[in-house]
Structures are given as C-alpha cells and as structure tokens.
C-alpha cells in the first residue's frame, strides 16, 4: 500500500510541476537479492492499481531497468517490456533507459535502444564510469545512431544527463552530502559533450 500511495502522490506532483512522465523502478533500489519469487507480480499489481491515475493526469509511466547489482529484477530493456506486459494496462507503456545500467545488462546498447523503439521516452546519459560523457569509454556515436533509427527526436522524448560520479555507492545523496558544484559540472559537461 505504501508504494501505491507514493505513486499517487508522485503522479499528482508530476502533473503539478508540468512533467510528462514519471520514472518507475519496479523493484527496491539498493536491494539486489529478491524477497521471494512473487516480487514482479506484486510490483505489476501495484502499478496496475494506479494505471488509470497515470492516464487521467496525462503522465506516462516510464519503467527503468536497473543493473542487477542494485535491484532484484527488471535489468534489461527486454525485462522492462515483459514487465509492461505483466502490468497489462495500456496506460502503462513506456521505458526509461539508462546507458550506465545498460552497460552491464545489455549485450549491445544500440540494439537495446532499437528494441525499446517507440516505448522509450527518456534516456539517462552518463559515461562508463558514471561520470560525465567523455570521461569514460561509452560509445556515444552508437547511442546517437540508435536514437536516430527509432525517431527519438520528437515531442515527448528526452535525453537526460545523469552523471552521478564514480564509486561503488551510486546514491551518495542517500548516505552523505552531495557536492552540488561537482554534480553541476558533470551535468554541464555531459550536455556539452552530447551536443558536440
């Protein structure tokens, strides 16, 4: 029930802020071991409960696959598509990709983007080391070509810089004090590098 209540608040907040999509991670971030074999089913049932609220508020639910070191299920674009099928409601039908997570879950990031196709509504960008683009080894040209192939340059589709910095703990804001100047520099650098 807590997850459903949280989603209801976030749907309303997203609409009030003028947002068009809400990122949804199906599993508990930071818990890579499953509780039991029914996690996906429970998660899909919870999202199905609020599906019509997404539709009523005009907000797209964007499912984000996360690497297996951080969540217990939904690690790839294929997993996200299967999760959307498990939810089984046309109001829940989008994907939020993240190239950092795709590096460990997908065999080829470009092919995964093409597989997501018109379901992809946002793509998080960070380099292979989770720093700004250009500071690691990500193949940005392949990513841009794949986005071009799926016609991503259209209304309702976004590419969002999300460099969080290197390290084993990807969520420093949860456990310590983030460095706003460093995060701002990495986001600015990522946006500039992408535009080049």
Label the predicted regions.
Residues 1-94, 104-106, 181-185:
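Active-site acidic/histidine proton-transfer and metal-coordination neighborhood
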Residues 74, 78-97, 102-196:
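Histidine-acidic metal/acid-base catalytic patches
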């Amino acid at each position: 029930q807590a997850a459903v209540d949280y989603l209801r608040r976030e749907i309303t907040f997203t609409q009030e802020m003028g947002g068009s999509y809400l990122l949804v991670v199906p599993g508990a971030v930071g818990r890579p071991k499953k509780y039991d074999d029914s996690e996906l089913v429970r998660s899909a049932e919870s999202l199905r409960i609020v599906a019509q609220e997404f539709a009523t508020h005009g907000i797209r639910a964007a499912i984000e696959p996360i690497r297996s070191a951080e969540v217990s299920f939904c690690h790839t674009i294929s997993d996200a598509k299967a999760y959307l099928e498990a939810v089984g409601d046309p109001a829940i039908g989008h994907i939020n990709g993240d190239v950092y997570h795709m590096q460990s879950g997908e065999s080829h990031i470009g092919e995964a983007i093409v597989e997501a196709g018109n379901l992809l509504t946002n793509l998080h960008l960070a380099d292979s080391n989770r720093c700004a683009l250009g500071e690691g080894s990500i193949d940005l040209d392949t990513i841009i070509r794949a986005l071009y192939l799926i016609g991503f340059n259209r209304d309702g589709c976004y590419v969002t810089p999300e460099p969080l910095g290197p390290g084993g703990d990807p969520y420093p804001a949860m456990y310590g004090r983030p460095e706003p100047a460093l995060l701002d520099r990495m986001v600015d650098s990522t946006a500039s590098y992408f535009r080049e």
